[in-house]
Curated annotation (Swiss-Prot):
Subcellular location: Plastid, Chloroplast thylakoid membrane
Residue sites binding phylloquinone per the record: 671
A single GO BP: photosynthesis
Residues engaged in binding chlorophyll a B1: 654
Gene: psaB
Protein name: Photosystem I P700 chlorophyll a apoprotein A2
Role, per record: PsaA and PsaB bind P700, the primary electron donor of photosystem I (PSI), as well as the electron acceptors A0, A1 and FX. PSI is a plastocyanin-ferredoxin oxidoreductase, converting photonic excitation into a charge separation, which transfers an electron from the donor P700 chlorophyll pair to the spectroscopically characterized acceptors A0, A1, FX, FA and FB in turn. Oxidized P700 is reduced on the lumenal side of the thylakoid membrane by plastocyanin.
GO molecular function terms noted in the UniProt entry: 4 iron, 4 sulfur cluster binding; chlorophyll binding; electron transfer activity; magnesium ion binding; oxidoreductase activity
Amino acid sequence: MATKFPKFSQGLAQDPTTRRIWFGIATAHDFESHDGMTEENLYQKIFASHFGQLAIIFLWTSGNLFHVAWQGNFERWVADPLHVRPIAHAIWDPHFGQPAVEAFTRGGASGPVNISYSGVYQWWYTIGMRSNTDLYIGALFLLITASMTLFAGWLHLQPQFKPSLSWFKNAESRLNHHLSGLFGVSSLAWTGHLIHVAIPESRGQHVRWDNFLNVLPHPAGLSPFFTGNWAAYAQNPDSTSHIFSTSQGAGTAILTFLGGFHPQTQSLWLTDIAHHHLAIAVLFIVAGHMYRTNFGIGHSMREILEAQRPPGGRLGAGHSGLYDTVNNSLHFQLGLALASLGVITSVVAQHMYSLSPYAFLAQDFTTQAALYTHHQYIAGFIMTGAFAHGAIFFIRDYDPELNKDNVLARMLEHKEAIISHLSWASLFLGFHTLGLYVHNDVMQAFGTPEKQILIEPVFAQWIQASHGKSLYGFDVLLSSSSSFAASASDSIWLPGWLDAINSNSNSLFLTIGPGDFLVHHAIALGLHTTTLILVKGALDARGSKLMPDKKDFGYSFPCDGPGRGGTCDISAWDAFYLAVFWMLNTIGWVTFYWHWKHLTLWQGNVAQFDESSTYLMGWLRDYLWLNSSQLINGYNPFGMNSLSVWAWMFLFGHLIWATGFMFLISWRGYWQELIETLAWAHERTPLANLVRWKDKPVALSIVQARVVGLAHFSVGYVFTYAAFLIASTSGKFG
């Protein structure tokens, strides 16, 4: 007899209902719960799966390179980056009529194509790629790398190559290896690529494998390095009149601290970027030698944590017991990793536009908008995941004995204070921000706009001024030429930085006013409310006054039956589920703000944002409605254009989003009755009744229906805004 899905759970495999399928899918990745799973096998499975993950990433990036080389216009774009639209790939669609074929044939292509809004053209150009051959070689290299990682994953599942549990628990070796090897050496290698290939290429000197060993990246070679005259590498940088990718105005410096942007490309100086990566490399290679492994020297993580006890004794046992708690809990480690990754992803979103690293990216407005939005949404999903695994840690891995009176135990002991403070902050922000917006709406509606409450963000303006923005006239720190801060850096990076921060042609420290003040606090409301829900979910995951034995019910449970009133919706999973809605809400406000602010900046019409962003109708009418009007009338009986595909995506994004509510609002009994009726009809319908199934149809559980609803809500939400963002930006700026 064939074994039924799921193989990993005999209990589920023998379930006579369709629950077998849905619960099987739901628990497929919950390795801990699988039959016969040991701790060692768990670590080995996860370790091997990382190689599979890398293989997928390399295959995907290889595909990007291959399709641009095959179907794109990279070489044409390289010749004129500001006026040629970069092509992602061709479109082969049998549904296209002649108007569609004409509308989508652009960028010098012979047939319909997709325009690239990912920034890969700018990235490849900046790092020294110039021809389709370069792209093909890159694609081939990544394909080989993908094969190698796939093989490595398979290899580490073979008995003789499976690492032991003690190897996985060796925190110091792993830290050294990852700090020095992963971050340090890879940063050093990247510095090498920038200095040997990218910087010469930006100066019109072509370096490839054939001449790699005979072209000196710097006229003086390595002698300044060995004689200690390192300053030589910073002398004679590219001039402000340098034309990128040519020798015109080019210098010879390879490691600089110029500050600001290259005037033509509006991106950071490549020599500054190389210097940054070299500094990071040195820092991490040193950091990777700090922990005690083979030679009995260096730090022990356990000793560091045990030593962290607050003096005076009133603040408990500090970090005592944390080493074993963290080292023995994969959920704790994953929570920390996701929190770090979430923060860095949001920082990437912020820096990709404000300190643009790639040549000509700053002039490609749609790509900037797409990259910002993409990274901000991903950051939101990753951050909510961090709290989810934090909650699972408290349920499955937390040992009260091991953590007596340390920071974790004390967090749990005063959770009421934490949760109520977050609640107070959320309520304060919500009522005051909404109150100001609504007051301003009323004043606009009654024809007295001068009675709006408009608050200048003076503290934020002061911070901008202290970084060198002179517009506000604060004359403080870097915006005051007589300050010590200004004189200390005057001969190095400061002139370039001051030019950049006071220029109106980039997004560094945008001028802010009352509209920014309001939306800043709306975003703060969203962040605090999301955090409140997530923190409450994790801190109440083990139990609460209402349900002291909650941890015995696991991470996700619908209710403890009708006997205990009020136990519905209080599992840690429910908190995660609710928080995702607030997270999406918050990222929505963040991206709305960023996009509208930049649209008006790029159009030279900042007054529109300044005047309309102080009341809600302004946001709805002058941002959402005004910019979606092309999409709402995207295709009609009189024809279509290249925005039609986004208009269609805008529509079906809304439909997916709306489908979510069907699962979120109607509950299990409705679906059970419906399914039983459908099964009855199916079994009595000719032809249809030839198809039979062995599993008795049962409705999704409450938790599963919520997952389905949440998935539709999230996917529809993202699709809708993606279509709106790309269409409204590319429709204006091409």
